[in-house]
């Protein structure tokens, strides 16, 4: 399980250091793709395979299902660590997430999310005030 929040810088070549505990959980080979809310999602291979199976079962006759799977899979790339524990984030994914220099890496249960520092701070500031309301709505899901 991934949890926690860390700040790191991305270098001019697009390489980002991921915290050691997240590297361990992601394994030697993992998948990064476009995430929701203008961030990136990183999945260990086993989680990615499970997600892929669920998404493959969506009805391709539905426009929303086609649009989502196109967006999600076209941005996906398999990654490995370099000797310094960094991952090279492709330019298209850096652009999607607005990554310039400072990044925030967060653990979210079965995945790691990578945010530009500015977008994370904006998202957090907007969401923090409604945390209680969101929690009340989740009661409907028996959480």
UniProtKB/Swiss-Prot annotation:
GO terms for molecular function: DNA-binding transcription factor activity; transcription cis-regulatory region binding. Residues 5-47, 76-119 form the SpoVT-AbrB domain. SUPFAM superfamilies: AbrB/MazE/MraZ-like (SSF89447). It is found in: Cytoplasm, Nucleoid. Keywords: Cytoplasm, DNA-binding, Repeat, Transcription, Transcription regulation. One of its GO terms (biological process) is negative regulation of DNA-templated transcription initiation. Its main location: cytoplasm. Transmembrane segments: none annotated. One of its GO terms (cellular component) is cytoplasm. Forms oligomers. NCBIfam families: division/cell wall cluster transcriptional repressor MraZ. Belongs to the MraZ family. This is Transcriptional regulator MraZ.
């Amino acid at each position: 399980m991934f949890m926690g929040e860390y700040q790191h810088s991305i270098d001019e070549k697009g390489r980002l250091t991921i915290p050691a505990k997240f590297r361990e959980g992601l394994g030697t080979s993992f998948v990064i793709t476009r995430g929701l809310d203008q961030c990136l999602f990183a999945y260990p291979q086993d989680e990615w395979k499970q997600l892929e199976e669920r998404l493959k079962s969506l009805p391709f006759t539905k426009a929303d299902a086609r649009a989502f799977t196109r967006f999600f899979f076209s941005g996906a790339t398999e990654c490995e660590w370099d000797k310094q524990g960094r991952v090279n984030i492709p330019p298209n994914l850096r652009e999607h997430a607005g990554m310039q220099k400072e990044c925030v890496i967060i653990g979210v249960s079965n995945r790691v999310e990578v945010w530009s520092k500015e977008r994370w701070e904006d998202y957090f500031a907007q969401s923090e005030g409604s945390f209680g309301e969101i929690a009340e709505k989740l009661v409907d899901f028996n959480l």
